[in-house]
Amino acid sequence: MSKRTCYAGDVTAEYVDQEVTLKGWVQKRRSLGSLIFIDLRDREGIVQLVFSEEFDKDALAVANSVRSEYVIEVQGVVKKRKPQAVNKDMKTGDVEVEVHTITILNKAKTPPFYIEDGVAVTEETKLKYRYLDLRRPEMQKNIFTRAHIMRSVHHFLDDNGFIDVETPTLTASTPEGARDYLVPSRVYPGSFYALPQSPQLFKQLLMGAGFDRYYQIARCFRDEDLRGDRQPEFTQIDLETSFLTAEEIQDITEGLIAKVMHDVKGIDVKLPFDRITWQDAMDKYGSDKPDLRFDMQIQDVSELVKDSDFKVFAGAVQNGGQVRAIVLPGGADKYSRKMIDAQQDYIKRFGAKGLAWLKVTSDSISGPIAKFFGDGADLVKAVGANAGDLVLFVADKAKVVADALGYLRTHFGHDLGLIDEQAFRFCWVVDWPLFEYDEGIQRWVPAHHPFTMPNEEDVHLLDTDPHAAHAQSYDIVLNGYELGGGSIRIHNREIQGKMLKALGFTPERAQKSFGFLLNALDYGFPPHGGLAIGLDRFVMLLTGRDNIRDVIAFPKNSKASEPMTSAPYPVADAQLKDLGIEVRADVDPEKEHEGDENLTE
């Protein structure tokens, strides 16, 4: 093979009248008899090749035999296109290469789908032929953007005194949250390693070892139910520091994100980011990861309706609940009763019993509950509605109200076109509760993880009322997605012991699960804290995708399997025998895991 002159996508006017050698894939071929055009594709783009008897008769014959996705090498001379043939949509659109030599480096079967953006093909097929899917320009762009982000992260953290340290991939199973992926030990029959759900404990130990500032682009593994922005194996930008306050860690993180946004998107984000307490986020936006690209704040009308004749509202308040509302500007004419009822059915999944609504006119109100509120003037004023608006109400327990209205706010924000899809709005959510109640397993769990330091003024509550304590934790949110989270950690063994006790750990169980950390805390650990940012989610948001599978080279599908390699699949009996493992076919995985610990977010 000859040495490549440049990438096909880089052949521009500066190469005119120069001899070039190019290599790549045949995107498409067009034959006009004595003239053949081939679009040659590589990672940088596409350039048009021209074959003619005038240039070389043999090259024309070979060009006539090639098909899509053949791998070829060509030599030729770059020429300017005729004005009427210029393609302004292509970087190389004002030139073409007159080819005199072509070599077929490899043939290709007809692909199961066209290698082009926007192709209509099932997700399963794209994953089965991922190596073909990754040839598409938008997929290449996603992976290059990911690499660009990682490069920017490395540069910033290296320049700010952080040291890149690898932590173990084979480690001990600890009750950190989701189910562990277990790896059986052949050397120790019946014993297992676990793949890390995060480097959390190891990075704390590195602070105890005196490294002061650690980072890692860390691979993490969690055996949990999947959704669009989750994968069983994922990557996070992991940081930990010693002797810094939460505010100082947030400042460093803002600097990191500002550099990435500048380097990758050419955007200078406004610093510092907005800060909102967890309680305000839930009250105003119905979410602990609020989308601040639009306003539409939730309004509390509990006091106004507690004595109303509408028993649903009055009863909710009397039973310790709330009545809250959102206003949909211009929604009165846009949404019919049928459309509103469809949302009423949807919010029942959050525990809401129903959705009340009013339409505002110039001098009155209408709707199923209008008769209970006269002309509705006080109610309209309280929620800040105007003529033509639609007001939605939910009455229930605080969490149910927040979850339901938070969903409705986001849904209608998109539907009404209130969200600038090109905007990036970062914010911090701070002052979290230390614990939250998990209705699914009917017990208290950490809002983040069991190594989070309570607020200084709340440490004493670990002895008396731990569930009232707040934490030195903070989440960074982008456009309604949790981008990352962190906290100041517990560096005192006594406080860590109280935290585990509040979670129901006996001293013996705490020592068995976290003994190595508890023992280490006896040897002079510094105050420390950190943060982790989900790299996959960050790339997804910066590339405008809606699924992290689009920004991971070889992801799993929604069933945690990989169609390309067929993983996971049964292994040979001999391998199982070496490990002392017997496979049972009658296991119900859900029942097997009932009562599992859930200690993290």
Curated annotation (Swiss-Prot):
User: What biological-process GO terms show up in the record?
Assistant: aspartyl-tRNA aminoacylation
PANTHER family named among the record's database cross-references: ASPARTATE--TRNA LIGASE, MITOCHONDRIAL (PTHR22594:SF5), ASPARTYL/LYSYL-TRNA SYNTHETASE (PTHR22594)
Native source organism of the sequence: Lacticaseibacillus casei (strain BL23) (Lactobacillus casei)
Q: Where in the cell? A: Cytoplasm
Query: What GO molecular function annotations does the UniProt record carry, in alphabetical order?
Result: aspartate-tRNA ligase activity; ATP binding; catalytic activity, acting on a protein; nucleic acid binding; transferase activity
- Coiled-coil zones: none
Recorded protein name is Aspartate--tRNA ligase
Please name the InterPro entries in this protein's record.
Aa-tRNA-synt_II, aa-tRNA-synth_II, aa-tRNA-synth_II/BPL/LPL, Asp-tRNA-ligase_1, Asp-tRNA-ligase_1_N, Asp/Asn-tRNA-synth_IIb, AspRS_core, GAD-like_sf
Q: Where is this region: Aspartate?
A: 200-203
Keyword Nucleotide-binding found: yes
